[in-house]
C-alpha cells in the first residue's frame, strides 16, 4: 500500500498564502494553515497519524482510519473541537465544524501545486523512510571501524574519553 503525506521540504515559505487560497478554491474551505515561529513560516497540514489522537477523542466517531489515511466525515462532525485540541500538529481547523487535509481526494494536492517556493511536496512515506535509512547507513559506512587504525573513529574517541586518567 502506498501512503503519501505532504511535507515541508524547505524553510522558504514567505506566507504568501497561495497554498491556502488554492486549497480553499479546491475544497471550498481552507484545510491548511500557516504558522509563524521565530520569523519563519511553516505550512501545517494533517500528517495522517498511524495512531491519531483526533480519532480517539471524537465523541461521534466522525474520524476514521481508512487505507492508512485519517478521514473526517464532516456530515457527522458536531463541531465540538476536541479533535483540534488533540491534534499534535495543529492541523485540524475549526469553523462551524472541523476541517482537515484530505490530500485532495487523490488528485495532485492544490497546495503543493500552488506553492511557488516549492516548500511543500507530496511524498511516498515508504520512500522517505528508506531514503533516511540509506543516508544513515551511508554516514555509518564512512566512519572508521574499531578494527581500523585511526584516531578519528567514533569508537576510538569514545574509548579514549572513557579511559580513567591517573
Swiss-Prot record:
Q: Where does [4Fe-4S] cluster 3 bind?
A: 46, 49, 54, 87
Q: Which Pfam families does the entry mention?
A: Fer4_11 (PF13247)
Question: Keyword Membrane: yes or no?
Answer: no
Q: Which SUPFAM superfamilies match?
A: 4Fe-4S ferredoxins (SSF54862)
Q: How is the co-factor bound, per the entry?
A: Binds 4 [4Fe-4S] clusters.
Q: Which UniProt keywords apply?
A: 4Fe-4S, Electron transport, Iron, Iron-sulfur, Metal-binding, Repeat, Transport
Name the PANTHER family on file: DIMETHYLSULFOXIDE REDUCTASE CHAIN B, OXIDOREDUCTASE
Q: What is this protein called?
A: Uncharacterized ferredoxin MJ0265
Q: Origin organism of this chain?
A: Methanocaldococcus jannaschii (strain ATCC 43067 / DSM 2661 / JAL-1 / JCM 10045 / NBRC 100440)
Lineage runs: Archaea, Methanobacteriati, Methanobacteriota, Methanomada group, Methanococci
